[in-house]
Amino acid sequence: MAQLQSVDNFSDYKVKDISLAAWGRKEIDIAEGEMPALMTLREKYRAQQPLAGARILGCIHMTIQTAVLIETLVALGAEVRWSSCNIFSTQDHAAAAIAAAGVPVFAWKGETEEEYVWCIKQTITKDGQPWNANMVLDDGGDLTEILHNEFPQMLDHIHGISEETTTGVHRLLDMMKKGELKVPAVNVNDSVTKSKNDNKYGCRHSLNDAIKRATDHLLAGKKALVIGYGDVGKGSAASLRQEGMIVKISEIDPICAMQACMDGYEVVSPYIDGVNTGAADGVNRDLLGHTDLLVTTTGNVNVCDKYMLQALKSGAVVCNIGHFDNEIDTRFMRDNWEWEEVKPQVHVIYRNKDQNDHLLLLSEGRLVNLGNATGHPSRIMDGSFANQVLAQMYLFERKFADLPADEKPKNLYVRVLPKQLDEEVARYMVQGFGGVITKLTQPQAKYIGVEVEGPYKPTDYKY
């Protein structure tokens, strides 16, 4: 357990209120007890100091759970500088506790867009000069993009990037395809212990929590439309169904759509015959006019466009649980309709105030579970952040930046961690639940063609 220290002689941070540090520390202590995989890694590798010499730039939601991640990285030898990857997701008491522990952190809930970029750049620089960072831990890809575009000289010294989320992985793969990615990256998002836990089970827990905190609405008996049925969509649909909502799914992928059907959801489209004509008359007004709640979950752009927003039932709640705020056309809403703040991250959007024709928009179209609530529980984030620690160790050990220049191109990649590491995280999580895993006998292992200690499934196995 890290101790609070005097910050009188430490000013390398900016948080909302440093006096919240004691509260944050109490919650961090509780979270540690709910993160068995991360804490097991901390104790297993503490003596070895595998991250000694690592200087990590971190840009991920500055929550209580992230504080446990940060202190695990520090316990394994790393230095870190931190910012949040979303203007609304910081928990101010968590940021204060990390600052009070002597870790440079620049994050507060309710940043402006300009402040958000400023915070990222404060992690990149120290005393006005680029910090001698050699590792990156990112969520969404904004830090990675700023480094490549504005601080390219720093990439000569960086061994790799570990990326947390679907959106960030898409950006990395796009950079790789275009020849723009200058350092290797580990795709943490597609580790099973991240994608199934965080994306699916985490959203199952946190979406309904956020909507109820924001609106105080009863959800049972009302109609919901979930846009997307990937892992985030699956968890989101389950979250609303367990509240008693009547849930329908919109999908572009026939495999995901088939899964939705098999899970008992009706697959529909917000467009007539599923075709987006780019015009108001192409919208399925009958569907949208009876929808009480619309949730976007895709990581794609404009999946709830202006024509859908115009057609939605008056009083409908609109929110997003994908990474960025461009899934819902909030620009159109700002340019054309009157906004009235009810409380932080809850706005009434008047399409016609005289007629009280309105929508309820949560978190301004950004991540609703972190804007209107506290995100996923510690036990969920345990798997994600254990993978982040292993990814940082994996990349730091391989020392990409120290390779001869002619060897670097063939060592660029975006890849997931080896399956055995994924299984290691899962094992620690099961042990944290008090579960007992059965061990294969040697004849059994031979029969199915695996080692007794794993890995147990081929890399292309679909869990």
From Swiss-Prot:
InterPro entries: Adenosylhomocyst_ase-like_sf, Adenosylhomocysteinase-like, Ado_hCys_hydrolase_NAD-bd, NAD(P)-bd_dom_sf, S-Ado-L-homoCys_hydrolase_CS. Binds 1 NAD(+) per subunit. The keyword NAD applies. Its EC number is 3.13.2.1. Keywords: Cytoplasm, Hydrolase, NAD, One-carbon metabolism. Its cofactor is NAD(+). Pfam families: AdoHcyase (PF05221), AdoHcyase_NAD (PF00670). GO terms for molecular function: adenosylhomocysteinase activity. May play a key role in the regulation of the intracellular concentration of adenosylhomocysteine. This is Adenosylhomocysteinase. It comes from Hahella chejuensis (strain KCTC 2396). The gene is ahcY.
